[in-house]
């Protein structure tokens, strides 16, 4: 019985280049258990804040097929919205794109 998936995913869209993460996804293929950073080389004090637990924990327990980055404070009530890091929207999008890639793989690559 499958209880979930751990998928390594990357996005080349980071301000400093490649962002690589590991994403835990429940067996339903839509609920994110959490993420962990494998590699990230973003601007100190801005994009590197993606590694702060307070930012990336917003993925924990979120359910959706594709997440979207919004300005900080705009997405708290919508399950598919991720609040951007202030001053680091590009990094926020890169991490979110990697999570979306992992979700896509679970739902389209594994289930075929």
Regions found by a protein language model. Give the residues of each.
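Flexible, solvent-exposed loop/hinge segments and secondary-structure transition points
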Residues: 1-112
């Amino acid at each position: 019985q499958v209880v979930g998936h751990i998928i390594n995913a990357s996005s080349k869209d980071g301000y400093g280049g490649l962002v690589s993460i590991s994403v835990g996804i429940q067996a339903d293929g839509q609920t994110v258990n959490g993420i962990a950073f494998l590699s990230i080389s973003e601007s100190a004090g801005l994009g590197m804040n993606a590694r702060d637990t307070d930012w990336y924990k917003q993925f924990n327990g979120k359910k959706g097929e594709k997440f979207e980055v919004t300005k900080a404070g705009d997405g708290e009530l919508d399950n598919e919205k991720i609040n951007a890091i202030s001053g680091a929207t590009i990094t926020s999008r890169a991490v979110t794109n990697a999570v979306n890639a992992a979700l896509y793989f679970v739902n389209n690559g594994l289930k075929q």
